[in-house]
């Protein structure tokens, strides 16, 4: 018999995390490496574990994720979003808790594009009155 498997896709900025959550002992693997090795910063590790700790499920599930694109913060938050979606799929009661904590909401903020005639997205060239 195949073991139960829950999937979720998380996105943040330009990062996409494809997440699989399965019953286990709490191991989190990202692109074939342990989460502590992949995300050395404690803030990123905390962000990744947030959905599991909210539901007191940290030692009950293993997480296997493949992440593409973006930088470390975008990747960590994409992974958090993917884990939250997978846990919501696993347990409909947990969905309300995750939603209230804002973990199921896709953070739509992204870098604003640069416009022609400007130095950056909004920075204008210096103006000389005379």
Swiss-Prot record:
The keyword Protein transport does not apply. GO terms for biological process: translation. Keywords: Ribonucleoprotein, Ribosomal protein. One of its GO terms (cellular component) is small ribosomal subunit. It holds the Pfam family Ribosomal_S9. GO terms for molecular function: RNA binding; structural constituent of ribosome. Belongs to the universal ribosomal protein uS9 family. This is Small ribosomal subunit protein uS9. It comes from Rubrobacter xylanophilus (strain DSM 9941 / JCM 11954 / NBRC 16129 / PRD-1).
């Amino acid at each position: 018999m195949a073991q139960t498997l829950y999937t979720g896709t998380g996105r943040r900025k330009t990062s996409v995390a494809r997440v699989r959550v399965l019953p286990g002992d709490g191991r989190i693997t990202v692109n074939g490496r342990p989460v502590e090795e992949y995300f050395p910063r404690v803030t990123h590790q905390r962000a990744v574990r947030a959905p599991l700790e909210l539901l007191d499920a940290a030692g009950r599930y293993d997480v296997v994720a493949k992440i593409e694109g973006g930088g470390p913060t975008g990747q960590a938050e994409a992974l958090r979003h993917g884990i939250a979606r997978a846990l919501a799929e696993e347990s409909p009661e947990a969905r309300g808790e995750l939603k209230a904590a804002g973990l199921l909401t896709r953070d739509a903020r992204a870098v604003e594009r640069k416009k022609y005639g400007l130095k950056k997205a909004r920075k204008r060239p210096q103006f000389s009155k005379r």
